[in-house]
Regions:
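Helical element adjacent to the flavin cofactor pocket in flavoenzyme catalytic cores
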Residues: 170-242, 246-251, 255
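Conserved Rossmann-like nucleotide-cofactor binding loop
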Residues: 18, 41, 250
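Helix-loop-beta segment of a Rossmann-like dinucleotide-binding subdomain
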Residues: 85-98, 139-142, 149-153, 157-203, ...
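Glycine-rich FAD pyrophosphate-binding loop
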Residues: 28-47
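Dinucleotide-binding Rossmann-like beta1-alpha1 core, especially the glycine-rich loop
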Residues: 50-160
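Central helical "cap/lid" subdomain
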Residues: 231-296, 305-308
Length: 327
């Protein structure tokens, strides 16, 4: 039981995006927070690159889930404005795909209205640009015109971002219109560095890096959590009023320590990095080639990085690392 006027002690296991964000949020409120991370730095788990501001990469999910993703993405950008890579995403449907661009447009219109309503509620929600510019469609005639334009070193509008797409995809094997949407990139390295700097500046937050939590017990006498952890080859023990399991895809290990196992699904998506000669100074948007999930024609994702590097990945059985559900 927490004594009256005594500050509650919170333990967070896992310093990934969720754990670091929770520690930062509670720390800014002045709560007593201790964050345990087994690696040498925060946000060092599986890489990410995309802000799903509307969930347009996932046709399989519902409209309600897409709206939820839009709202969560806006909240995330407001909390971490410094981690955005401001580049749009282009959505392409191959001729072989069973879907149509028109089906996507219905959802995009819904998301545009939802975004407009969120801006009306709070002007600070306008983090994806103007609502009327949330997405733009391009017919083939427009793409053919852009194909003849010179590349722009620093694109400032949708048309300039679309030029390298028009020049490099096979226009005879895709459906029109092509769609550009304001789903931005996320910079993993800025997030890791920024959260570390902010957390280190908070007196109410204690960071235990390179610390492995190996046991957690419930003290029924005072209703506290006893966390045992290894740091610098020594075992330590601390007592907390609240415990947050933020261990990411290793969440099940902490569940087992608590004696409270639960079912979970972990999906791993393979990714590869390649360098494209001659594209060092070309600013590409992200490009999504839709496909049927889990088939040889699964979605392909083309994510640009500086100096002509690109991350390539897709949802097919051949490159998905694990097929079975994992604990």
């Amino acid at each position: 039981m927490i004594e009256k006027n005594k500050k509650a002690k919170i333990a967070i296991v896992g310093g990934g995006v969720a754990g670091a964000s929770a520690a930062l949020y509670f720390g800014q409120l002045g709560l007593d927070v201790t964050l345990f991370e087994k690696e040498t730095s925060l946000v060092s788990g599986p890489p990410f690159c995309h802000l799903h501001a509307g969930g347009n990469l996932y046709r399989e999910i519902s409209d309600t889930q897409c709206v939820t993703l839009l709202k969560q993405s806006i909240d995330f950008l407001r909390f971490y404005p410094f981690i955005v890579d401001y580049r749009p995403t282009v959505i392409v449907l191959p001729l072989s795909d069973s879907g149509t661009p028109e089906a996507l447009l219905l959802r995009l219109d819904l998301l545009t209205r939802e975004y407009e309503a969120l801006i009306a509620q709070d002007a600070d929600n306008k983090v994806l640009g103007e609502s009327e510019n949330y997405y733009k469609r391009y017919d083939r005639s427009e793409i053919e015109v852009l194909k003849q334009q010179e590349l722009v070193k620093t694109p400032k509008n949708c048309d300039e971002w679309m030029i390298p797409v028009a020049k490099n995809i096979d226009l005879n094997n895709v459906q029109f219109p092509l769609i550009m949407v304001q789903e931005y990139g996320l910079n993993l390295f800025r997030l890791a560095a920024g959260t570390a700097l902010m957390l280190e500046s908070l007196e109410s937050v204690t960071l235990h890096m390179e610390s492995i939590v190996h046991n957690i017990q419930k003290n029924c006498t005072n209703d506290a959590w006893i966390v045992s952890y290894l740091k610098e080859d020594k075992s330590h023990e601390e007592s907390f009023d609240y415990l947050i399991n933020a261990a990411g895809f290793r969440t099940g290990k902490i569940d087992d320590l608590l004696g409270a196992p639960c079912k979970a699904m972990v999906e791993f998506k393979a990714a590869y990095v390649s360098q494209w000669d001659g594209c060092d100074d070309t600013c590409f948007p992200e490009i999504i080639f839709h496909g049927e999930r889990g088939t040889p024609q699964g979605m392909g994702q083309f994510t640009p990085y500086p100096n002509g590097f690109f991350q390539l990945h897709g949802m097919t059985k051949e490159i998905t690392l694990y097929v079975q559900i994992l604990r």
